[in-house]
Amino acid sequence: MPSFDVVSELDKHEVTNAVENAVKELDRRYDLKGKGSFEFKEKELTVNLTAEADFQLEAMIEILKLSLVKRKIDAQCLEIKDAYASGKLMKQEAVLKEGIDKELAKKIVAHVKDAKLKVQAAIQGEQVRITGKKRDDLQEAIAALRAKTFDMPLQFNNFRD
């Protein structure tokens, strides 16, 4: 029986490239030159932003989002934490979310069932496997999932006949 997996993954190499591009953009901007920094921690998938003022942090977040989108990474995976003061500097953390949590998996399964397609959806850890009798049914399921916006970017992989 044909099947495919619904996942939410990040290409860590592309994220690294996006952060490096954001650092270059930060150096290019006259209003932010030498006043802020990005620090990417690959293991925790976090980006620490440091700046002198709150408005500079907001501009840096926009630069980071723009860099992610240019590298074809959905900005929805970015979770921005609250800014806090640390001495003379303002700091903020941006966490990159990866994987489908149980709540989102339940929403995906419910959406597939509500679409009344001839497919079955099963939660398997951080992914959802969708199985059907025909390839056309699976393509309809993909179209239904793409039409609805979830709070995480979804990818479809492991398509098997």
UniProtKB/Swiss-Prot annotation:
Molecular function GO terms recorded: nucleotide binding
InterPro entries for the chain: DUF520, UPF0234-like_C, UPF0234_N, YajQ-like_sf
Gene Ontology CC terms: cytosol
Keywords in alphabetical order: Nucleotide-binding
CDD domains per UniProt: YajQ_like
PANTHER family recorded: UPF0234 PROTEIN YAJQ
Sequence similarity: Belongs to the YajQ family.
NCBIfam families: PRK05412.1 (NF003819)
Protein name per UniProt: Nucleotide-binding protein PFLU_4927
